[in-house]
Design a protein with these regions (language model features):
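A short glycine-rich, aromatic-capped structural motif
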Residues: 2-54, 67-71, 149, 195
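Compositionally biased, intrinsically disordered low-complexity regions enriched in proline and serine
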Residues: 6-9, 34, 46, 109, ...
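A residue-level signal for beta-strand positions that form part of recognition/binding surfaces
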Residues: 10-13, 27, 32, 131, ...
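Short, solvent-exposed loop/turn segments at secondary-structure junctions
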Residues: 21, 40, 95-97, 165, ...
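Functional-site microenvironments in short loops/helix caps that host divalent-cation chemistry
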Residues: 59-62, 68-187
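Short, structured beta-strand segments at or near domain termini in extracellular proteins/domains
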Residues: 187-198
């Protein structure tokens, strides 16, 4: 089984090996799954929706697609499943948190302190209120970029996870969640895609 493969249109999926997620005080088993290394980009989303309007900020092809509501994110997954012939979906909250923590037990995947956080997280203190290039921060131990900060990410349960470039660093974390209406769009909301192995 490969650790990564490239899929149309250019989404890189990393294998997240199964394990046990600690959610609150509970241990929850997690089956292996694939998760995109980065949130879906403008050029990837435009392949699904050519009429997609990019953020008003300067926006490159490989910048994250923002302003996407839950139904659009789910629609992208369904479309991607058809063109790739692979069952794609949004990650569950448990999968998302497990992938974010990357089997670490500290507050952040890089430790309990925010010292050095700027190497891993785009947040309100280091992002000049513009969508930052998410691939420019270091990945977590699972090889995933911008799991914390960057953009809020939709999950299958319509809950946003992780915080964004507008969130103060102290309010960002793998367990951070935000409940919004499914039609909520903002220039700090994006999404990743996932695929089960079975």
């Amino acid at each position: 089984m490969p650790d990564r493969y490239t899929h149309y249109p250019r989404a890189i999926l990393w294998l997240i090996r199964g394990g046990e997620a600690t959610i609150g005080d509970e241990k929850v088993p997690v089956e292996p799954f694939y998760l995109s290394k980065l949130p879906i980009s403008n050029i990837q989303f435009e392949a699904f929706d050519p009429a997609f309007k990019r953020s008003a900020h300067p926006s490159r092809d490989d910048d994250v697609a923002v302003g996407v509501d839950f139904e659009q994110a789910r629609g992208y997954c369904e479309w991607y499943a058809r063109v790739s012939r692979k069952p794609m979906r949004l990650p569950t909250e448990v999968e998302w948190e497990y992938a974010c923590r990357a089997e670490t037990t500290s507050k952040y995947f890089f430790g309990d302190s925010t010292d050095g956080a700027d190497r891993y997280v785009w947040h309100a203190g280091n992002s000049t209120d513009m969508i930052p290039p998410l691939h420019k921060v270091r990945p977590n131990p699972f090889g995933l970029h911008s799991m914390l900060g960057g953009v809020w990410e939709w999950t299958a349960s319509r809950v946003l996870r992780g915080g964004s470039y507008r969130t103060p660093l102290g309010d960002i974390g793998c367990g951070v969640r935000r409940v919004d209406e499914p039609d909520q769009r903002a220039d700090d909301i994006g999404f990743r895609i996932a695929r089960s192995l079975r």
